[in-house]
A protein has these predicted regions:
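Juxtamembrane helix-loop boundary signature in multi-pass membrane transporters
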Residues: 1-10, 105-167, 283-312
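Glycine-/small-residue-enriched transmembrane alpha-helix faces in small-molecule transporters
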Residues: 1-36, 74, 147-178, 202, ...
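Loop-to-transmembrane-helix transition segments
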Residues: 4-12, 51, 59-83, 156-165, ...
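Helix-helix packing/entry segments at the starts of transmembrane helices
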Residues: 11-12, 35-38, 77, 81, ...
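Specific transmembrane alpha-helical segments of multi-pass solute transporters/efflux pumps
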Residues: 18-22, 55-94, 99-100, 136, ...
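Membrane-interface helix-cap regions at the ends of transmembrane helices
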Residues: 22-25, 29, 43-62, 132-152, ...
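Transmembrane alpha-helices of multi-pass small-molecule transport proteins
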Residues: 29-79, 106-110, 168-172, 189-208, ...
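C-terminal transmembrane-helix exit sites in multi-pass transporters
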Residues: 46-54, 103-128, 132, 260-280
Length: 312
């Protein structure tokens, strides 16, 4: 299973991008905070049986472990999304997206500090390749392109918010790997959704962003349910199953499946949106890097097992 862990994370990250066509419809009439709240409500309904069957596990968690769970649920699920969205009010989308590409490097740094993960020269080679591939996918012209009507606006507040989002997302990968040494992937998923839902509920009530439910159409409810299942609970089950056997430093690079899938989804669903050759090359480079990182992850696991056996 250690060999397939990075592939599961890559597949989960690609699922995160499938909600784009539905969100385009939903954001026309509903606030982003309310959309995320309802998604988490549906997700909590699905994971509630798991939550109830594992109450003893929750009682056994240490203060440090609860801190990690809260970081993931509040930081990774809520605050990161809010910070990244707010960054667009201060800087151009292209600047925010470019800064978000620092997320893997932040996660690698946290993995080295918090989890004491070690890296060899091969890891850094595949890391550079993966980041280069992701960069080509997002910026096919080899440089960060401004969107129509944009002018360069490197506002310090916007830069800070984008980096905060990258920190929370990168940190959530590391904290998730830490927690999975104590709980299984199903318990981790249920914890994340439940605590995030409670936080989002209070945030929506405070900001008064919950609309009259009568104004939410049947199509809205259907799309919210689809998003909650596909890019929500299903993708996180797959993600945490993969993270159980994957180093956090490898996992954060496997998450680059998200920008690749986002470009493909745009190509399929947005009229006159075409894939250009740098993006196709970037996809090939990224896939090769993920394949190589998967082998690296397996080799590191075998090495760790041998060291453990010898020490015993």
């Amino acid at each position: 299973m250690k060999r397939f862990g990075p592939y599961l994370i890559f597949a989960a990250a690609m699922l995160w991008a499938t909600d784009a066509p539905f969100r385009v419809h939903l954001t026309k009439d509903l606030s982003s905070n309310f959309i995320v709240l309802v998604e988490h409500f549906f997700d909590v309904l699905i994971v509630l049986p798991i939550l109830l069957m594992n109450l003893k596990v929750f009682k056994a968690l240490s203060l440090k472990q609860w801190g990690a769970v809260l970081f993931i649920a509040i930081g990774g699920s809520a605050l990161a999304s809010v910070a990244f969205t707010q960054a667009f009010h201060y800087v151009n989308p292209s600047v925010a997206i470019l800064l978000q590409k620092l997320q893997p490097l932040i996660a690698i740094g946290l993995a080295a500090t918090f989890l004491k993960e070690n890296f060899n020269s091969k890891f850094w080679l595949w890391t550079i390749l993966a980041l280069f591939g992701a960069y080509l996918i997002s910026f096919a012209g080899f440089k960060a392109q401004l969107f129509p009507g944009e002018t360069l606006n490197p506002n310090l507040m916007g830069v800070g918010l984008a980096l905060i989002a990258a920190f929370f997302w990168g940190g959530s990968t590391v904290m998730g790997r830490y927690m999975l040494s104590s709980v299984n992937f199903k318990v981790m998923t249920s914890l994340r959704f439940t605590l995030a839902f409670v936080f989002l509920l209070f945030m929506n009530l405070y900001q008064k962003s919950i609309p009259q439910l009568s104004t939410v159409t049947k199509t809205d409810w259907l799309f919210l349910l689809i998003v909650a299942i596909t890019s929500g609970v299903v993708s996180l089950f797959i993600y945490y199953k993969g993270l159980e056997t994957t180093k956090a430093s490898v996992a954060t690079l496997a998450e680059l499946g998200f920008p690749m899938a986002a470009v493909i989804v745009n190509w399929v669903f947005i009229p006159n949106s075409a894939l250009v050759w740098p993006q196709i090359v970037g996809m090939g480079v990224l896939l090769f890097a993920i394949f190589s990182l998967s082998r690296y992850n397996q080799q590191q696991a075998i090495k760790a097992s041998k060291i453990s056996l010898n020490s015993n």
